C-alpha cells in the first residue's frame, strides 16, 4: 500500500482536450473496444476518482507530447 504522503503518477492517453487529442481518443476507443473493457477518461474524471480514494494535491503537469499521453500526479492524504 502507498503510505500517507506517497505520490502516485498516472501516465496514459486521456480523453478530451486540444485537437490532436481527438485522434488519441479515437485510437484508444478502438483499442478498448477490441479488448472488451476500459475506456479513456478525462483528466477531470481521473482527478475525481483520485480525490474519492483519498488523494490530494492532484495536478496535471504539461507533457512534451500531450497528444500521445498525459500525466497526472497525486499525493496520498
From Swiss-Prot:
The gene coding this protein: crtF
Keyword Zinc on entry: no
Keywords: Carotenoid biosynthesis, Chlorophyll biosynthesis, Methyltransferase, Photosynthesis, S-adenosyl-L-methionine, Transferase
Family: Belongs to the class I-like SAM-binding methyltransferase superfamily. Cation-independent O-methyltransferase family.
Gene disruption phenotype: Cells accumulate demethylspheroidene as their major carotenoid during anaerobic growth and demethylspheroidenone when grown in the presence of oxygen.
Family annotation (PROSITE patterns): SAM_OMT_II (PS51683)
Reactions catalysed: demethylspheroidene + S-adenosyl-L-methionine = spheroidene + S-adenosyl-L-homocysteine + H(+)
Source domain of life: Bacteria
GO molecular function list: hydroxyneurosporene-O-methyltransferase activity; O-methyltransferase activity
Free-text function comment from the UniProt entry: Methyltransferase that mediates the O-methylation of 1-hydroxy carotenoids. Converts hydroxyneurosporene to methoxyneurosporene or demethylspheroidene to spheroidene. Also able to produce spirilloxanthin.
Name of the protein: Demethylspheroidene O-methyltransferase
EC number: 2.1.1.210
InterPro entries, A to Z: COMT-like, O_MeTrfase_dom, SAM-dependent_MTases_sf
Species name: Rhodobacter capsulatus (Rhodopseudomonas capsulata)
Pathway: Carotenoid biosynthesis; spheroidene biosynthesis
Cleavable signal peptide: none
Amino acid at each position: 500500500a502507498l503510505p500517507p504522503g506517497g505520490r502516485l503518477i498516472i501516465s496514459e492517453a486521456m480523453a478530451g482536450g486540444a485537437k490532436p487529442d481527438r485522434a488519441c481518443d479515437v485510437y484508444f476507443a478502438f483499442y478498448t473496444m477490441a479488448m472488451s473493457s476500459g475506456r479513456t477518461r478525462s483528466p477531470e474524471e481521473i482527478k475525481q476518482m483520485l480525490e474519492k480514494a483519498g488523494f490530494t494535491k492532484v495536478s496535471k503537469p504539461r507533457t512534451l507530447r500531450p497528444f500521445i499521453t498525459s500525466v497526472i500526479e497525486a499525493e496520498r492524504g
